[in-house]
From Swiss-Prot:
Boundaries of every HD domain copy: 325-418
Protein name (Swiss-Prot/TrEMBL): Ribonuclease Y
UniProt-annotated location(s): Cell membrane
Documented EC number(s): 3.1.-.-
Transmembrane segments: 1-21
Membrane topology annotation: Single-pass membrane protein
InterPro entries, per the entry: HD/PDEase_dom (IPR003607), HD_domain (IPR006674), HDIG_dom (IPR006675), KH_dom (IPR004087), KH_dom_type_1 (IPR004088), KH_dom_type_1_sf (IPR036612), Ribonuclease_Y (IPR017705), RNase_Y_N (IPR022711)
First-tier enzyme category under EC: hydrolase
Length: 509
């Protein structure tokens, strides 16, 4: 019984256990199913999210690729346009070169035609000369002389016709200038102050009656004065004042002193003019010497040869591009000395070289060569050292500097010249033209003096009367005018006047 109860109990327990176990298994299965469904949903959601992100990334990548493609397209378009522009420019250059080649070919063709014409002209001329020589062989001396005279007359007539044309054109130009005078008044008002300090001097008179005495009977006094001094004496309506005009300051100053002495003395006639002129020349020499001594005193340069001091004084009356050469030399000496002092170099030698660096300008209108070459020769002649000579030669680069002081002098020269307002180009060009005119006239044989006057519109040439007759004087005037025309550029018409004067002097005792 007990065994049966135990068996029943066991069976019941087994049944209950089975039921409970089955229930638990079913519960676990349901939970597993729920978990599987949940995981499946979660996986689906994650898959959707991954898909969405992949789509977004794909779209971004596509957009980025599109942008890169657009940028590449723009770059290629830009390169294409640049290439097209370069091609167009090359085409333009090629086109211009073709035009230039065409023009050169045309010019060459014209030149060839001109050469052919010149060749034919030469052949014709040779033929004419052969005929003339054949003809002259059977002529007398008088007949040949007459032919030469006729040809010379024809040549002069041709030159006169050209001169007439130039004079006419000059008058038309002057008329046009006068028409513009009102417009240019403001500019012209500055001209006397700008140029007056260099090219003109005024002399005050006690009264206007003195003007008549200065002119003299039939103008003999004024003619004598201008001939002796080489300066224009301008007498106009300005009350109690006459004007002296010359580009050469030394001549002008001597003329001023001469005229002041004549006015003070009151006796004005040719002999008195010559006497006062000689006195004024002596006075001028004294002024030149004093100016040179003052320059050496201001700069502290000692031991200069007396002739060098005299040449320094002459620089007071010379200008370079409107700058006073003596003032410029003093300025260069002081600037160079200051720089030498800062660098611990030889101050005295530098100052001496700076003062003498333009000494050649005192004679460059009288001696052939550049002012540096002339200055070096002068310094050598009067015992200056090789260093000083090198400073003179090297300040314009004509010789290499051999010492640092030479470099300082060149630098100081450039500083002084480059200072605002120190120099003027147009005046120097004008003066060089006048000096060149005088040199051309002086290059002819038997010429005593030559003066460029009337602002460079006239050259007066004084010849030796014993060696030149009237016919030769006419010929010389023509030849000088021709040479100036060929070698000098000048506005308007230039007049050449050759003066031949013979004086006979006797004394009654």
């Amino acid at each position: 019984m007990i065994i049966l109860v135990a068996v029943v109990t066991a069976v019941i327990s087994f049944g209950l256990g089975y039921v409970v176990a089955k229930s638990r298994i079913e519960q676990k299965n349901r939970k597993a199913q729920q978990d599987a469904v949940s995981l499946l949903k979660k996986a689906e959601q994650e898959a959707q999210e991954i898909k969405r992100k992949a789509i977004i990334e794909a779209r971004e990548e596509v957009h980025k690729i599109k942008e890169e493609i657009e940028e590449e397209k723009k770059r290629r378009d830009l390169e294409h346009r640049s290439l097209e522009e370069r091609l167009l420019k090359r085409e333009e250059i090629i086109s211009k070169r073709e035009e230039l080649v065409d023009k050169k070919e045309t010019a060459l063709e014209q030149l060839r035609v001109q050469l052919e014409a010149a060749k034919k002209k030469i052949e014709q001329r040779e033929k004419e000369l052969d005929e003339r020589f054949t003809k002259l062989a059977g002529m007398t001396v008088e007949e040949a002389r007459q032919i030469v005279i006729d040809e010379a007359r024809q040549k002069y007539e041709h030159d006169l016709a050209i001169l007439y044309k130039k004079i006419k054109e000059n008058y038309e130009e002057e008329a046009e200038k006068e028409a513009k005078k009102i417009i240019a008044t403001a500019v012209q008002r500055y001209a006397p102050e700008y140029i007056g300090e260099i090219t003109v001097s005024t002399v005050s008179l006690p009264s206007d009656d003195m003007k008549g005495r200065i002119i003299g009977r039939e103008g003999r006094n004024i003619r004598t004065f201008e001939k002796i001094t080489g300066v224009d004496l301008i007498i106009d309506d300005t009350p109690e004042v006459v004007v002296l005009s010359s580009f050469n300051p030394i001549r002008r100053e001597i003329a001023r002193l001469t005229l002041e002495k004549l006015v003070t003395d009151g006796r004005i006639h040719p002999a008195r003019i010559e006497e006062m002129y000689e006195k004024s020349k002596q006075e001028m020499e004294k002024m030149i010497k004093e100016a040179g001594q003052e320059a050496t005193f201001v700069t502290g340069v000692t031991g200069l040869h007396p002739e060098l001091i005299k040449l320094l004084g002459k620089l007071k009356f010379r200008t370079s591009y409107g700058q006073n050469v003596l003032d410029h030399s003093i300025e260069v000496a002081q600037l160079a000395a200051l720089m030498a002092e800062e660098l611990g170099l030889d101050v005295d030698r530098t100052r001496r070289g700076g003062l003498l660096h333009d000494i050649g300008k005192a004679l460059d209108h009288e001696v052939e060569g550049s002012h540096t070459e002339i200055g070096a020769e002068i310094a050598r002649r009067y015992g200056e050292s090789d260093h000083i000579i090198n400073m003179i030669m090297s300040h314009h680069g004509e010789q290499e500097p051999v010492c640092p002081e030479s470099v300082l002098v060149a630098a100081a020269d450039a500083l002084s010249a480059a200072r605002p307002g120190a120099r003027r180009e147009s005046l120097e060009t004008y003066i060089r033209r006048l000096v060149k005119m005088e040199k051309i006239a002086m290059s002819f044989k038997n010429v005593e003096k030559a003066y460029a006057i009337q602002a460079g519109r006239e050259v007066r040439v004084i010849v030796e009367p014993e060696k030149i007759d009237d016919v030769e004087a006419d010929k010389m005037a023509y030849e000088i005018a021709k040479k100036i025309e060929e070698e000098v550029e000048y506005p308007g018409v230039l007049k050449v006047v050759v003066i031949r004067e013979k004086r006979s002097i006797a004394y009654a005792k």
